[in-house]
């Protein structure tokens, strides 16, 4: 089994599994129940199910930002949110400084 296949299967059985959505995004996205999801879509879904998931916020920032619960978030907004939920997230601090 590949990592992508495992994440896709996990989401087939538990569609609200935020960590699986995040990991599927890290792998570049995938298909769940016949629907194709991009990296951005995966991170947005992860945050729909767990808005406090710092890794998903960070990764959404890395890919350019996105929309969560109808609100648009820039890269900077995403890194700031990641830091709200994990103040010691070194890479989020670094990327916030780069932006």
Give short role names for the model-derived ranges.
Residues 92-99:
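Short, intrinsically disordered, charge-balanced linker/junction segments flanking boundaries
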Residues 8, 14-15:
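Intrinsic-disorder/low-complexity detector
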């Amino acid at each position: 089994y590949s990592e992508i296949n495992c994440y896709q299967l996990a989401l087939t059985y538990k569609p609200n599994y935020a960590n699986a959505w995040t990991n599927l995004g890290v792998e570049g996205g995938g298909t769940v129940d016949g629907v194709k999801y991009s990296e951005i879509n995966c991170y947005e879904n992860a945050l729909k199910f767990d808005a406090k998931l710092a890794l998903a916020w960070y990764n959404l920032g890395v890919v350019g930002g996105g929309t969560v619960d109808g609100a648009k978030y820039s890269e900077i907004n995403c890194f700031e949110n990641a830091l709200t939920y994990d103040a010691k997230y070194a890479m989020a601090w670094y990327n916030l400084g780069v932006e």
